[in-house]
Amino acid sequence: MVKITYISHSCFAVELEHSVLVFDYYQGELPLWDPEKTIYVFASHRHYDHFSKEIFRWTEQYPKIKYILSDDISEASYDASEICRSDLTRIAPNQTETIGNCVIETFRSTDEGVAFLVSCEEKLFYHAGDLNWWHWEEESIDYNRQMRKDYQREIRKLVRKKIDLAFVVLDPRQGGAAFSGIEFFYAERQGKPCVPNAYVERLWIDGSSAYF
């Protein structure tokens, strides 16, 4: 059984038998987890609503904690001096790293930083960060065409991956284009489960949970 908890904005926590994955925390109340579990904290990029140095305070409660940060997050933006270097990994697009019992693969975002594909305890999870089919009416035709091309290129890399659950951007600020990214993802994945994230307060209540 896997427990999914929505924290806020793009942040979800995935609780497994021995591990917890926390993606893109910036605010909100966390559940209480067994301190014997290993906590993996992911930050996909530097935007204020995807990263907070608050995460480094969690070491007081959870001694088995690992941080995986996109390399666009400047080291000057946080004080990680008290964190053992072996507990913090900076990661770039198109990398694969094994950290603890997780195998982590990254993809290039169409905005900043990376998207994560994480294999943990025989489950495979995808978190988009800000990798999305961004389309803005105020931008040029060439800009929007390039965004479509870049997004589709990255998502097609996932076609053969047996993802158990995916967290995919749904941003209503895009108006009629808001569903383009998640619809393309869903079609390429042949209807496999995906969870909308980012600006989805109408769909989720902070702190709400689901199991699968």
Regions found by a protein language model. Name each.
Residues F56, Y62-S109, V114:
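Portal/gating segments that form or line small-molecule/metal binding sites
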Residues I4-H9, Y78-I99, Q174-F212:
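Binuclear metal-ion centers of metallo-dependent hydrolases, dominated by the metallo-beta-lactamase
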Residues A13-L16, L30-K37, W58-E60, E75-I83, ...:
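Short loop/helix-cap segments at secondary-structure boundaries that form the rim of catalytic
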Residues Q27-E75, R156-Q174:
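Active-site metal-binding motif and surrounding structural segment of the metallo-beta-lactamase
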Residues S10, Y25-Q27, H45-R46, D72-I73, ...:
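Active-site metal-binding loops of divalent metal-dependent hydrolases
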Residues M1-W33, V114-E139:
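Conserved beta-strand hairpin/beta-sheet module of binuclear metal-dependent hydrolase folds
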Residues T110-E183:
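Active-site-proximal loop/helix segments of hydrolase catalytic cores
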Residues V14, H45, I104, D130, ...:
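Divalent metal-coordination and catalytic microenvironments
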